[in-house]
Amino acid sequence: MENDFVVAFAQNLKNLIGEMSISEFARRVNIPQQTISRYLLCQREVSLRNLIAIADHFGEDIDYLIGRKD
């Protein structure tokens, strides 16, 4: 399922999560850990609802998360 959007999102999410565990991050944004893992492995496209939750959590622009802005 790799496409530019999925790959960019996975890389940006990895950078933002940093040293935090996937389980801790998943708990904070109320998204199942398996879903976060699949995002990071480029196995699933992020839903709009989850994209907004992640952007809000980090105080980031959605365009940044999907690779449309540095």
Where in this protein do the model-derived segments appear?
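Short coil turns linking two alpha-helices in DNA-binding domains
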Residues: 21, 32-35, 47, 61
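Recognition helix of helix-turn-helix/homeodomain-like DNA-binding domains
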Residues: 30-45, 68
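Conserved hydrophobic/aromatic packing and binding residues within compact polymer-binding modules
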Residues: 13, 25-26, 36-39, 65
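DNA major-groove recognition helix of helix-turn-helix/homeodomain DNA-binding modules
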Residues: 49-64
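Short, locally clustered residues in the helix-turn-helix/winged-helix DNA-binding domain
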Residues: 14, 41, 55
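Short amphipathic recognition helices of helix-turn-helix/homeodomain-type DNA-binding modules
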Residues: 64-70
